[in-house]
């Protein structure tokens, strides 16, 4: 049974992939791998009016960066292809025709003006116009339920524009099961007759989705909560075709950090965080939207963070490798209620992953930043720097702020720290310290610390009177790694030069 698990991620190429979409892909991927199943990418491009040319490649690039590759999809193991719905449109017409022949669908020739008039007429009476059993065979509606077969054929032959609607059954209580939300019951009398095939010759999402899921042998439909209202129609379509219905699981929304509602790009722009996995450039406006990759997030930390937006393992553990997530993931642990996004938590995850990264990997990421600043140092030196600062970093982009003093002397000194720590007598102490440092032969961190502290002890003064001005001289502020590690790294001559510079300026 487990090897028959087949799930799909089916985004529409209408723009960049939102992190909510990435989470849907991730949950599908985790579920598939947990059950030794297949993860499929299908591009649902039936809405040609909203199609964006570079969106499909963006989706594929995003999944690749997130390390959640698809097993089947465009250009890969196309056993059930093609995997773009626009390349399957002839197929859908056959299935729409089948529904008409079996009485589950009908032709509608109403123009948009006709429908607007019906809506306004109903609104004038304080009613909502719903195209369903209540009025589809009454009044002035023009469809194959009120026209004769000859009249319908005449209209089709004349090239009249038509849509095909699903004929929702009347007076039926539909009982459904969702893997996350449990039992769902709905009265079919409350449903409208959705369009299955549009006037432009393309199917709607509903028909194409069901046909493709059946033909691609999808066993579980794991998708966002926004599709929950479509579940009754989709279940009825399976019934109409006499096909086995897959199991459904509707994921909770990702909510904005502040206030109520679904997380949007506007929230990210307002609060200063990305909502897309990769940077995205709008080809029309040339507007650039930030991406988690370009903002310095590690893909594995990003995925770990996303996994907890709606799911938890039932333990206190928060840090998981991808393999760990696969082993722990279970739909029964997915929440029904929305998950509030936290930019701070996203940063926290990145910081946790920073500590687990191999220093060599971090050096490779930091070296281009140094190169842009015109700094060239051997790899072993940068490796030592990274090992000293990474515990204080959230992003690799933080490295320069945390380590610039290893590469260049400070050009200014923190005013508040200078006022507090460079007092009367400090210049004399620092001048004497230069002599002490000059006479140190073993300039290792341990030995330098030992000799300078012995000198301070012998002078019977507080350590702070020397250590704080010394750190200020070398770093420019009262921050940074262990002071004597800095001294050992920059060397004797540079240490002396910086103290002399501080004496001169302070």
Regions found by a protein language model. Give the residues of each.
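Active-site-adjacent bridging/hinge elements
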Residues: 2-5, 34, 207-210, 274-280
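Active-site cores that bind ATP or allylic diphosphates and position pyrophosphate for catalysis
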Residues: 107, 111-267, 274, 288, ...
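Residue-level signal for inorganic ion chemistry
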Residues: 28, 59, 99, 103, ...
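Glycine- and acidic
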Residues: 7-13, 40-45, 216-221, 284-289, ...
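Catalytic adenosine-cofactor/nucleotide-binding cores of aminoacyl-tRNA synthetases and other
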Residues: 242-413, 475-506
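N-terminal Rossmann-like or analogous alpha/beta NTP/dinucleotide-binding catalytic cores
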Residues: 1-128, 229-240, 301
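C-terminal accessory/binding modules appended to enzymatic or scaffolding proteins
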Residues: 418-479
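Generic alpha-helical structural context detector
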Residues: 61-64, 97, 304-307, 327, ...
């Amino acid at each position: 049974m487990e090897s028959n698990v087949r799930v799909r991620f089916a985004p529409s190429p209408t723009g960049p992939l939102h992190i909510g979409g990435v989470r849907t892909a991730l949950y599908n991927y985790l579920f598939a791998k947990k059950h030794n199943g297949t993860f499929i990418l299908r591009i649902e491009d039936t809405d040609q009016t909203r199609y964006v040319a570079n969106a499909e490649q963006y989706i594929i690039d995003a999944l690749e960066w997130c390390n959640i590759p698809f097993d089947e999809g465009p250009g890969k193991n196309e056993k059930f292809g093609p995997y773009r719905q626009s390349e399957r449109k002839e197929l859908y017409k056959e299935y729409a025709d089948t529904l008409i022949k079996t009485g589950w669908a009908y032709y509608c020739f109403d123009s948009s003006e006709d429908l607007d008039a019906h809506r306004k007429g109903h609104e004038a009476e304080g009613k909502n116009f719903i195209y369903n059993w209540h009025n589809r065979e009454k009044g002035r509606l023009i469809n194959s339920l009120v026209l004769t077969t000859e009249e319908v054929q005449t209209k089709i032959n004349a090239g009249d524009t038509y849509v095909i609607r699903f004929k929702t059954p009347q007076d039926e209580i539909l009982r459904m099961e969702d893997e996350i939300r449990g039992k769902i019951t709905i009265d079919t009398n409350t449903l409208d007759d959705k369009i299955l095939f549009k006037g432009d010759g393309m199917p709607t999402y509903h028909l194409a989705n069901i046909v493709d899921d059946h033909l691609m042998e999808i066993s579980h439909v794991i998708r966002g909560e926004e599709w929950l209202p479509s579940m009754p129609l989709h279940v009825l379509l399976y019934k109409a075709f006499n096909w086995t219905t897959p199991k459904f699981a509707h994921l909770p929304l990702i909510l904005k950090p502040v206030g109520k509602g679904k997380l949007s790009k506007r929230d990210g722009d307002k609060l200063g965080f990305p909502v897309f996995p990769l940077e995205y450039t709008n080809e029309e406006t040339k507007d650039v939207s930030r991406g988690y990759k370009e903002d310095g997030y590690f893909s594995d930390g990003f995925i770990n963070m996303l996994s907890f937006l709606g799911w938890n393992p039932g333990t206190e553990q928060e840090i998981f490798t991808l393999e760990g997530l696969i082993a722990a993931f279970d739909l029964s642990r997915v929440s029904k209620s929305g998950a509030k996004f936290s930019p701070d938590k996203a940063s926290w995850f990145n910081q946790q992953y920073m500590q687990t990264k191999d220093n060599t990997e971090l050096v490779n990421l930091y070296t281009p930043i140094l190169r842009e600043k015109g700094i060239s140092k051997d790899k072993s030196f940068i490796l030592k720097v990274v090992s000293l600062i990474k515990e204080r970093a959230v992003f690799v982009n933080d490295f320069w702020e945390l380590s610039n003093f290893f590469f260049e002397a400070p050009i200014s000194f923190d005013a508040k720290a200078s006022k507090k720590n460079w007092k009367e007598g400090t210049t004399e102490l620092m001048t004497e310290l230069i002599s002490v440092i000059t006479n140190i032969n073993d300039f290792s961190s341990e030995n330098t610390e030992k000799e300078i502290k012995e000198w301070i002890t012998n002078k019977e003064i507080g350590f702070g009177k020397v250590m704080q001005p010394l750190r200020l001289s070398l770093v420019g502020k009262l921050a940074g790694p262990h002071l004597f590690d800095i001294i050992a790294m920059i060397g004797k001559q540079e240490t002396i030069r910086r103290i002399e510079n501080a004496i001169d300026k302070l």
